Curated annotation (Swiss-Prot):
Primary localization class, coarse: plastid
PROSITE patterns: RIBOSOMAL_S18
Gene Ontology molecular function: small ribosomal subunit rRNA binding; structural constituent of ribosome
Keywords: Chloroplast, Plastid, Ribonucleoprotein, Ribosomal protein, RNA-binding, rRNA-binding
Source organism (scientific name): Larix occidentalis
GO cellular component terms, A-Z: chloroplast; mitochondrial small ribosomal subunit
The family this protein is said to belong to: Belongs to the bacterial ribosomal protein bS18 family.
Protein name as annotated: Small ribosomal subunit protein bS18c
Amino acid sequence: MKQTMDKPKRSFRRHLTPIRRHLSPIGSGDRIDYKNMSLISRFISEQGKILSGRVNRLTSKQQRLMTNAIKRARILSLLPFLYNEN
């Protein structure tokens, strides 16, 4: 027969760190649109690549809209696909 020994129960308190909410770099009045070049240019690297959502601090929905706006601006020749290093 097995003898079971009950371990004393301890209450564990997790040290909760406060979650910081980062303010979105896009203001409430700014609209994500392919024509808004001043906004779009902030989310493109020097090489012309689209920056990731972590770097941008955008939500996933905002990142999706921004990516579509950048691609649309590239197709309409408002933005270059590549930047020359010359």
